[in-house]
Design a protein with these regions (language model features):
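Canonical Rossmann dinucleotide-binding motif of NAD(H)/NADP(H)-dependent dehydrogenases/reductases
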Residues: 2-38
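Catalytic loop of short-chain dehydrogenase/reductase
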Residues: 14-23, 27, 96-135, 139-181, ...
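A glycine/serine/threonine-rich, flexible loop-to-helix segment
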Residues: 50-52, 181, 191-217, 256-258
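Rossmann-fold cofactor-recognition segment
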Residues: 53-72
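Short, small/polar-rich loop/turn modules that mediate ligand/substrate recognition or access, typified
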Residues: 180, 185, 242-244
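Conserved SDR Rossmann-fold cofactor-binding beta-strand/turn motif
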Residues: 185-195, 235, 248-250
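Short C-terminal tail/terminal secondary-structure segment
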Residues: 232, 243-258
């Protein structure tokens, strides 16, 4: 896939560590020739990311602070990206958060604050980020976010995050309609369970991975590299006719009825 994204400037939001889905995406995009811009919420996170990039000999076009809970921070971040890079051609939204206590027990016990927090970071952030990113996508482009089967079905303990992901998937469709006139595509990857830092907070996560190995058509779990390659496809011109879609990268588990 070398050269598939040559000369494309792509913003990646959500790299926390080497286990992050966003890190798998980073590797795929870099190997395809993309110029990468990264956003992080805090200086400390940015320092960790610099070390990670250096370790893997990946050169970033820019590192920018961005707190997606703040509209001002988002506006400032994309103003900085415009100043440093100019035009961008793609954006990876790999951001989600819910309080650990909301990811166990019954969904009916979800707190108001916990519900709003999950929606704000996991779903509304895509709306706010798209609003600013489209201003820099003067040549068209592609936006890809990450979702999960819990948006479509009841997954035990996924609770408030499942509802947030459902909101995210609906937003993908509405945003695809809004920015399509600018030749910008918006799609989502629904990945199977992957051992990320965020996944540790979901009660019973290991059991979910075992079920995939037993019941999915391919009888195996997916990894961050497979999700990375699928995301790279959506960001490339190979997917130029696709928008508003949610594509499952889960070894086919989503087709199984029980």
């Amino acid at each position: 896939m070398s050269g598939l994204l040559k000369d494309k400037n792509i913003v990646v939001m959500g790299v926390a560590n080497e286990r992050s889905i966003a890190w798998g995406i980073t590797k795929s995009l870099y190997n395809a020739g993309a110029n990468l811009i990264f956003t992080n919420r805090q200086e400390r996170s940015q320092t960790k990311l610099k070390k990670l990039l250096d370790k893997h000999n990946i050169e970033a076009l820019a590192l920018v602070n961005c707190d997606v809970e703040s509209d001002d921070s988002i506006v400032s971040a994309f103003a900085e990206i415009k100043e440093k890079v100019g035009t961008i051609h793609g954006l990876v939204h790999s951001l989600a958060f819910a309080k650990t206590e909301e990811l166990q027990g019954e969904y009916a016990d979800t707190s108001r604050d916990g519900f709003l927090l999950a929606q704000n970071i996991s779903a509304y952030s895509l709306v706010a980020v798209t609003r600013e990113a489209r201003k820099l996508m003067t040549e068209g482009g592609s936006i890809v976010t990450q979702t999960y089967l819990g948006a479509e079905r009841v997954i035990q303990n996924y609770n408030v995050m499942g509802v947030a992901k459902a909101s995210l998937e609906a937003s993908v469709k509405y945003l695809a309609e809004d920015v399509g006139k600018d030749q910008i595509r918006v799609n989502a990857i629904s990945a199977g369970p992957i051992r990320t830092l965020a996944a540790k907070g979901v009660s019973g996560f290991n059991e979910k991975m075992s079920v995939i190995e037993e019941k999915a058509p391919l009888r195996r779990n997916v990894d961050q590299d497979q999700v990375g390659d699928a995301t790279m496809f959506f960001l490339s011109d190979l997917a130029r006719g696709i928008t508003g879609e949610v594509v499952h990268v889960d070894s086919g588990y989503h087709i199984i009825g029980g």
